[in-house]
Amino acid sequence: MLKLKKAIKRITLCVAVVFLLQILFLFSGYNNSDVKAATTFNYGEALQKAIMFYEFQMSGKLPSWI
């Protein structure tokens, strides 16, 4: 019975510590408000690289268009 009480106290303490840490991070101003949008992507280049990767990974009897 004594071990059960100690275990319950430890679990309660751990939950309280985690809760307090969450509140600390929530209200401490820990936010990335300086996050900027990603630069524009060149989808044509991405498609070209994807097709090249597909062609380079081919094995076996290759089609005539290569």
UniProtKB/Swiss-Prot annotation:
UniProt cross-references to InterPro entries, sorted A to Z: 6-hairpin_glycosidase_sf, 6hp_glycosidase-like_sf
GO BP of this protein: carbohydrate metabolic process
Domain of life where this protein originates: Bacteria
Protein name: Uncharacterized protein in celB 3'region
Organism encoding this protein: Caldicellulosiruptor saccharolyticus
